[in-house]
Amino acid sequence: MMTAPKITFIGAGSTIFVKNILGDVFHREALKTAHIALMDIDPTRLEESHIVVRKLMDSAGASGKITCHTQQKEALQDADFVVVAFQIGGYEPCTVTDFEVCKRHGLEQTIADTLGPGGIMRALRTIPHLWQICEDMTEVCPDATMLNYVNPMAMNTWAMYARYPHIKQVGLCHSVQGTAEELARDLNIDPATLRYRCAGINHMAFYLELECKTADGSYVNLYPELLAAYEAGQAPKPNIHGNTRCQNIVRYEMFKKLGYFVTESSEHFAEYTPWFIKPGREDLIERYKVPLDEYPKRCVEQLANWHKELEEYKNASRIDIKPSREYASTIMNAIWTGEPSVIYGNVRNDGLIDNLPQGCCVEVACLVDANGIQPTKVGTLPSHLAALMQTNINVQTLLTEAILTENRDRVYHAAMMDPHTAAVLGIDEIYALVDDLIAAHGDWLPGWLHR
């Protein structure tokens, strides 16, 4: 009989996310007896997660053991899979700092977790902690596979494979499969009938093909129907995530201009480009329904909901949840059993996309089986899509170089190359903004930045 894997969860205080991932795990026959090692630096949140996970396990008829740890290396000992999901500095103080300091300098943001000054600062405070996980994995579980859910995904993934190329890791996001489901809803079709091919970089991948299976078994291109639905005012569907602030206009407008649909949400995409958020251009904000300061608002709401949900889970006799769209359990099951699956992952560009820089971090379809995660070759992207992605890769390249070489100048250069920042601020203003952000974050950032 096959032994059960050990699954270590770093950042287990993220109770709701843990619930989604492990809810999927416990419904996989091969993973029902897995050893779940929960690790968090906050003992209170760790214990809360333990209560929820135990009820989740019992409700699903799973019978593995659960251990709780505040020491990372202890939790990682002999792990087969390592799930990483944390936010260094949290909503308070660090996310608030990213938004408030930028706002003082005249730069508005929506999410600030991927690119721009917010994404840059988040990378600088996060990557050293990811490197420490890689260091510990090298020592106590060198053959484990890391499933990384931490943003900024591209910069984090790149920095890890640059310094620790021997660590098996993949960056995971739900934007590819999540957006496909949204588009199916917009067109009133069953998501199960979709067939698509998607590629690019994290939060800026495009559906190169988007098709639907017809009654006779053939596939038809959905793009003409999608464009017609948008122009007729029938798409996007309102309130798709229960959030009236986010109306998804930006992505549909980009689809009209580019001919391909992008994976990440409109509120994210608006700040990856120079076109939607400009000082004194309230007309653009109104026309494209750009939700400024969306992430801080979302954090406040999520914290309130989290406390309410947590109390419900703690008081419930059993917890039954629907399957999530996250790839984690699919990957674990495929590697552990050898049953092949396909996921979309963020990996090193080793000849996968010809017209993006070799070595940059790309998001492509990956085959997963007992051999591990095997990215598939895409070839050449449409040139205008590659050009747009390159503007974001420029920032990722410079920030990754900054932290690998401990070069503060490259942090300024990364901010200078950010499309949104460059459209709003002058060079000296960008330098002043970076200086203020570094000073405001203090010890949350690596020491070399303060030398």
Question: Residue spans of the language-model regions?
Answer:
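Short helix-capping segments at alpha-helix termini
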Residues: 29-31, 56-63, 164-165, 187-189
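Rossmann-fold NAD(P)-binding glycine/threonine-rich loop
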Residues: 92-163
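Short acidic low-complexity segments
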Residues: 65-78
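N-terminal Rossmann-like dinucleotide-binding module
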Residues: 7-36
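Redox-cofactor binding/interface segments in oxidoreductases and associated redox assembly factors
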Residues: 77, 83-84, 148-149
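NAD(P)-binding Rossmann-fold cofactor-contacting core
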Residues: 30-54
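Long, compositionally biased stretches enriched for glycine and/or charged residues
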Residues: 188-451
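Internal, well-ordered domain-core segments that constitute the primary functional module
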Residues: 133-214
